């Protein structure tokens, strides 16, 4: 875990890690979103050559984050899996068996379509739309937050959009990087899975974005 940045929200400390996770210090929660496990297997099943190592590398990063932070609970803000069951789901179960001591909760996303019995057997608690912990709420798509009545001080964590920003370099070149995106009312986590697309943000003046560049997390100054 070479790099992290502390971001404070409502007097709570959140550690943004280059591993594309957030660790909530006060509650010992590890938060991540959009792993899209099984996506590489889904593409290979369709005849598209995608290296099997991609999913293994994502799982190694996942396990490394758990070993480093030693969370009391892991909260996945949607899209743990990409599609119906395939061989990569079986591989996940093997890793999960080694991490049975860590409670896991999934706020279901639009890609989480495997049967509920599967999650039960994997020891993963599931929530359909919104999960609350104190004054912080967790939802896959921030648009679903409109259904929850906000009280003063409430703050949302979400995923779904795979946020990114474009950074210009020399020679009028630009590169796109995944980022943590914070507004006054909600945050959007970068996709944890590396075999995912990104959505280019246009942050407002009051927003904050923290860019993930290899082994670093950097505050993006517009």
Annotate each predicted stretch with a short phrase.
Residues 1-77, 82-222:
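Extended recognition/assembly regions associated with phosphoester-bond processing machinery
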